[in-house]
Amino acid sequence: MTSTVITGIGELTTNDDELGKLTDAALVVEDGRIAWIGPSTAAPAADERFDAEGRAALPGWVDSHTHLVFAGDRTAEFAARMDGKPYEAGGIAVTVEATRAATDAELAANLRRHIAEAAAQGTTFVETKTGYGLTVADERRAAVVAAAEADEVTFLGAHLVPPGADADEYVDLVCGEMLDAVAPHVGWCDVFCEKGAFDADQSRRVLTAAAERGLGLRVHGNQLGTGPGVALAVELGAASVDHCTYLTQSDVDALAGSATVATLLPACDLSTRQPLPDARALLDAGATVALASNCNPGSSYTSSMGFCVTTAVLQMRMTVDEAIRAATWGGARALRREAGEDAVGVLRPGARADVQVLEAPSTAWLAYRPGVPLTHTVWRKGVRVTGR
């Protein structure tokens, strides 16, 4: 593989504690990884050269929460919600019906389209979930489709109890035959621990069964109200608890005292007209915070991590640096991919070469110029995937 030197970087955000934020910087990409970082004046020769011409550069976005194996459209539900109808997660069943009716090829094409859409906006690492099949066969095929395209795959058979099914009998199915069918194709298991979905005991059963099969744990929790999601995630050592819209002080303290990441999904809260999470309370308490898109056809149909960063800065009292770290390193931490060989969400020698250059001299422009497309050029695994 050829090497590339990206030089003339006006401001380089690395997320590395030793390197920090550099000015007039350069980096070298070789064999899909970062090979060197330092001053532009000291940049070594490479096979190819890209002059950033004073633009800002940073790690590619790490989107640690999406639902991209789906078919169909829920525009009517969105319009009804904007007209005052409350969001209660019931529309998931609409997507389940459409997804079951779609072919594998149709699901794969839709997934690839959304990953490409995200990449054009700077996202270089994507987690996605099953959860719109809710039968053994449909969850398995969703997992297979996702594993062929996404960086990380999560089993979410416990997304909703299918219409007409008994909740406890469905949990039995998820914990047994369904998990056995999908486990070879996924790295994670998630559960929607919320009123109207799965209670704490049911959620614990699913997560315990997944852990016994060697899967990492994640939780949808505290989206529609206070509840047991955060406490359960911390108790079981889940890598992340996602949404965190409604938190008690004990929830905040529990997250701050644990390795569980609080993954915030502001685009979802805006779309469902929920309050935005209290990111400031979490950060001030010492919790690790991630930002993710929650891209899905119902409650958050956006792949724009930049939009989430902008919202976090303008509406959630996060600084630009905090929001960028949450959307890169934080997402990587939520997937346990922030350290070691082939790390993402960070720029340092040895890390995966996922780099985005902005059409801006500073990352502050992500919030300073809201709504303006600022992605200039993107490299994923050292390969230039988009650029002006």
From Swiss-Prot:
GO terms for molecular function: imidazolonepropionase activity; iron ion binding; zinc ion binding. The keyword Iron applies. It holds the Pfam family Amidohydro_1. It is found in: Cytoplasm. Its cofactor is Zn(2+); Fe(3+). 4-imidazolone-5-propanoate binds at residues 74, 132, 159, 299. Zn(2+) binds at residues 65, 67, 220. Gene3D superfamilies: Metal-dependent hydrolases (3.20.20.140), Urease, subunit C, domain 1 (2.30.40.10). Pathway: Amino-acid degradation; L-histidine degradation into L-glutamate; N-formimidoyl-L-glutamate from L-histidine: step 3/3. Fe(3+) binds at residues 65, 67, 220. N-formimidoyl-L-glutamate binds at residues 132, 296, 298. It comes from the Bacteria. Its main location: cytoplasm. GO terms for cellular component: cytoplasm. It is an enzyme of class 3 (hydrolase). Keywords: Cytoplasm, Histidine metabolism, Hydrolase, Iron, Metal-binding, Zinc. GO terms for biological process: L-histidine catabolic process to glutamate and formamide; L-histidine catabolic process to glutamate and formate. Catalyzes the hydrolytic cleavage of the carbon-nitrogen bond in imidazolone-5-propanoate to yield N-formimidoyl-L-glutamate. It is the third step in the universal histidine degradation pathway. Belongs to the metallo-dependent hydrolases superfamily. HutI family. PANTHER family: IMIDAZOLONEPROPIONASE, IMIDAZOLONEPROPIONASE-RELATED. HAMAP family: HutI (MF_00372). This is Imidazolonepropionase. It comes from Saccharopolyspora erythraea (strain ATCC 11635 / DSM 40517 / JCM 4748 / NBRC 13426 / NCIMB 8594 / NRRL 2338). The gene is hutI.
